[in-house]
């Protein structure tokens, strides 16, 4: 706590000194700060102000910091051969909501954009299983998942295209029960994205029950009953 208090005093004194300057530089802005203190520091530096009294350049690997900023305030910096390339997140359309909901993804190198929360859970479950078998985790390799909301089949491809423009490697995992617009899918693939889906006309739950053995289905139902109760599971089956 003494360390945090000391850091907080240093941060505030830095801000006071910077108030009379035009530029402030901060490396790893989240270091030593609890989330609510980090949010307050960013506010103090003008994260929510429209004016430009102080120009701040800072680095961060914190999703908490990213959520406190607008897309126009965030830049992705990558090394390409012998140079660095800087891309402004706000230059990409329809990105602000993704920054708020899936801030962790912007700190990754490779992203799996999932149609909904079920696909995210499925991917994380497989990753955990493979990790327990001795394979390197997707997260350890710099990967992240994005939940596109599951509302429209085009949505995950549109979000995937937006992330491609920022230099991320992107894979879309989508259901096949509601076909997306072909031109949207083609634009995503033309930009370098990849996608996987189930067999024709199937969603995740369809594919699971068509692919699992009888014993596997029994285990899946037993797990559902254990979590949600027999009555609720029975109502959904009806």
Task: Give the positions of each predicted feature.
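Anion (oxyanion) recognition and catalysis
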Residues: 50, 164, 189
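Short, surface-exposed amphipathic charged segments that create phosphate/polyanion-binding patches used
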Residues: 90-94, 154-163, 207-219
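Short glycine-/polar-rich loops that comprise or flank the Walker A/P-loop
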Residues: 21, 70-73, 108, 140-142, ...
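Hydrophobic/aromatic beta-strand patches that form the interior of the parallel beta-sheet core
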Residues: 57, 75, 171-173, 196-197
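Activity-critical C-terminal alpha-helical subdomain
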Residues: 175-238
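Conserved nucleotide-binding/hydrolysis micro-motifs of P-loop NTPases
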Residues: 62-65, 81-82, 118-119, 176-179, ...
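Conserved helicase/translocase motor-coupling segment
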Residues: 110-186
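Switch/communication elements of ASCE P-loop NTPase nucleotide-binding domains
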Residues: 1-104
């Amino acid at each position: 706590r003494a360390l945090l208090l000391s850091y907080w005093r240093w941060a505030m004194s830095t801000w006071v000194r910077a108030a009379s300057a035009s530029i402030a530089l901060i490396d790893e802005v989240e270091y030593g700060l609890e989330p609510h203190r980090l949010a307050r520091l960013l506010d103090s530096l003008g994260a929510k102000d429209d004016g430009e009294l102080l120009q701040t350049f800072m680095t961060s690997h914190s999703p908490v910091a990213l959520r406190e900023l607008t897309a126009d305030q965030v830049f992705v910096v990558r090394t390409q051969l012998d140079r660095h390339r800087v891309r402004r997140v706000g230059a990409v359309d329809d990105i602000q909501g993704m920054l708020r909901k899936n801030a962790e993804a912007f700190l990754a190198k490779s992203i799996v954009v999932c149609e909904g929360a079920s696909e995210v859970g499925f991917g994380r479950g497989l990753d955990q299983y493979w990790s327990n078998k001795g394979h390197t985790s997707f997260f350890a390799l710099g990967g992240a998942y994005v939940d596109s909301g599951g509302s429209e089949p085009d949505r995950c491809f549109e979000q995937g295209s937006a992330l491609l423009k920022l230099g991320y490697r992107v894979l879309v995992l989508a259901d096949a029960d509601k076909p997306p617009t072909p031109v949207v899918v083609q634009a995503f693939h033309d930009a370098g994205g990849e996608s996987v889906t189930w067999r024709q006309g199937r969603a995740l739950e369809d594919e699971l029950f068509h692919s699992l053995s009888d014993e596997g289905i029994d285990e899946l139902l037993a797990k559902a009953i254990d979590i949600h109760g027999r009555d609720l599971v029975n109502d959904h089956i009806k």
